């Protein structure tokens, strides 16, 4: 059977919050089977815990933020994407602030931390959510949908009237039975427009954003000296974000997710609709030889 996974060891890192601009320490720790991904705010007296769950999403302005009562954890999507890409089912995430650090704006630093900690298979079957009926959420010309598919595939399209984005391509499909999350998705960085920076900061957003943790474009070009990591890095990052948002379900998906000009808000609307439509999905597990796609197998050991 395909087994659940956790971290082999605890590991720590540090960075700044994209929106808060504050330094944050992050720790990733092993967790027992069927725990899921649970965030721990160590800066709150007595500690405060909140599980990654679509129903805990409280804000989707430029990032996915979860909350439960007075507890908030912001910008969870890049870390969640890395956990999904490496097949981590169970982990505790310790934070001494209100936001997951942005690192370099992609999922790659979180992938690196997880790889350094090591990955351990646990003695319990990994449960997948298999999509059995199509489901769609839309807002004007923006939409996201899930369809039955024996594997995991993500398609996304953006539509920005910008020369760099037009030249690089604004559509992509990634079939994870045929290619690697680590190669095709993990290094794609978040992006923003220089003309919007001041307005965002007046709203208390993007206070920690800079050329080290985001692609920044003016009206004509990319301002980062190193340029792009992929010619279509902008739309690949939307794939990265979507994978992170989808993983709030707590289980890997078997199905085809597609999106058009969408973002975190529609992703969450789709997940909430899915949870209400129990006829549109089912829990499944797989023997190794029958798995419709595989996860990265770097540094994986088996637990006793």
Swiss-Prot record:
It catalyses: a UDP-3-O-[(3R)-3-hydroxyacyl]-N-acetyl-alpha-D-glucosamine + H2O = a UDP-3-O-[(3R)-3-hydroxyacyl]-alpha-D-glucosamine + acetate. GO terms for biological process: lipid A biosynthetic process. One of its GO terms (molecular function) is metal ion binding. The keyword Metal-binding applies. This is UDP-3-O-acyl-N-acetylglucosamine deacetylase. Belongs to the LpxC family. It comes from the Bacteria. The lineage of its organism: Bacteria, Pseudomonadati, Pseudomonadota, Acidithiobacillia, Acidithiobacillales. Keywords: Hydrolase, Lipid A biosynthesis, Lipid biosynthesis, Lipid metabolism, Metal-binding, Zinc.
